[in-house]
Amino acid sequence: MGSRLEEFKRGSDYLICIDSDGCAMDTMDIKHYRCFGPCMVAEWGLEKWQDALLARWNDINLYTGTRGINRYKALGIILQEIDRDYCPIPGLRALENWIAATGELSNKSLEDAIAAAKAAGSSAEGGGNPEGAAGNPAESDGTEAMKKALSWSVHVNEGITALSEDEKKAFPGVKEALASLKGRADLVVVSSANLQAVMDEWKKEGILEYMNLVLTQNDGSKAFCIQELLKKGYDENRVLMVGDAPGDYDAAAKNNVCFFPILVRKEEQSWRKLREEAADRFFSGSYRGEYEEAQIESFRDNLR
């Protein structure tokens, strides 16, 4: 199995790209239920409204059209709602501006933005800070929400790392589907997750062996990865993206390749359908058109 996009060589006329979290691996729900939401409540001291806010967090990230959204974009959405409906979020505007403007929604990018804001604040003060000298420096430079967002993200990562390996399982039917597809198409993981986490989880579940290549966040966006894979000589009609989130569909649509959805809360049935029905249509050239449109409509209805 290869590990680098530029070194990968096409071995089949067909290519099937498969997302990891929430698609092949049943790891998405537990990360949000146990890590993302609870860490947000703890970071901002929102225990008073915990039940409502955790439910809202899960709706945003798991069960509606924003499923699979970047963590910082999701945080921006819910903090706006909290600021409006529950309690003030100091420094929210600066965090919103960073989310909207940054080219990279990552911890490192946020760290750099906080440092830049601090430097700009010091320069503007000209060495003095009569109003904020005794106060909270985060408040004086407007970065309180940015700093808390970074702390939240770090704690989320720590929480995910602490999850036991037994809690990270492939969905039922994934292994059987991959086994049936192996040899008929090149199989590539296309995920926005961490490379080592994907490699470890897929290996533990005995499904890494079916894959020809693993592409993750360090290789670029899903759309970019598919775009680069197409340069290996695949026909658009012979490329299928299998995913569970609107971002997966968008990546397929941007490259004009086929899309098959793994429906949230119906994952086992979806993988069975891929193995028993959709794959044959894909390989026979009858997937596109009415059949694919019906799958996409079911996908959209399931996230409403």
Language model features with spans:
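Short, basic/aromatic recognition patches
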Residues: 2-5
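Extreme N-terminal starter segment of soluble prokaryotic enzymes
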Residues: 13-15
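Generic enzyme active-site microenvironment
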Residues: 17-19, 242
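Alpha-helical substrate-recognition element adjacent to the catalytic core
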Residues: 23-126, 132-199
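C-terminal cap/substrate-recognition subdomain and adjoining C-terminal extension
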Residues: 128, 166-186, 194-304
